[in-house]
Amino acid sequence: ARSRKKMLARERIEYLLDKDSPFLELLPLSGLKNDSGFGPGGTNITGIGLVSNKLCMIQSNVGTKKGGSVDYATSYKSLRIGEIIEKNKLPTINLVESGGVNLPDQDKIFINAGKNFKQITQRSKLGLSTISLVFGNATAGGAYVPGMSDYTILQKNAAKVFLAGPPLVKMATNEIS
């Protein structure tokens, strides 16, 4: 990340928060007993903090941890966070850099991912805004969150949002993209 002049996930959170705002990190040990090799907390840092003097739920993908790809712990964590958002009527800010679903875990993740996407649309209907800021690759499932957000900001010359890369397009259609 440093060699590419990118901020780390926690630095992005600190930069976003109001000066001297505390950050209450939620579910940092999610997936502690998971054997997928992702370690505790999954591939996002999530918590509550003040942004423009308003309590917000902040979710930051850890792009330096398996490309921010989503494992079971991360998908479960997102569902639980969605419940907390709705119960506490919080707007959400996503700091996105995600390779989408970790393919070896996809059979364990797709149901949770679908529920998570449904939660995003339900929150929008309730007037609970979702804002996404994309800092790097947002691939496949990682592209859905900014695509479904009420507001999306893409970092100039860095953000890339796509559902499939050239190898997958070639495999599926036999065409070069």
Per-region residue spans from a language model:
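Intrinsically disordered, low-complexity segments enriched in small/flexible residues
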Residues: 1-56, 60-67
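Short glycine-rich loop/turn motifs
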Residues: 42-46, 55, 90-91, 117-120, ...
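A structural preference for short, pocket-lining loop segments at secondary-structure junctions
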Residues: 49-62, 77-104
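A short, small-residue-rich loop immediately preceding and capping a beta-strand
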Residues: 56-59, 68-70, 90-95, 127-138
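Flexible beta-alpha connector loops of hexameric P-loop NTPases
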Residues: 66-73, 105-110
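Conserved catalytic cores of soluble enzyme domains
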Residues: 96-177
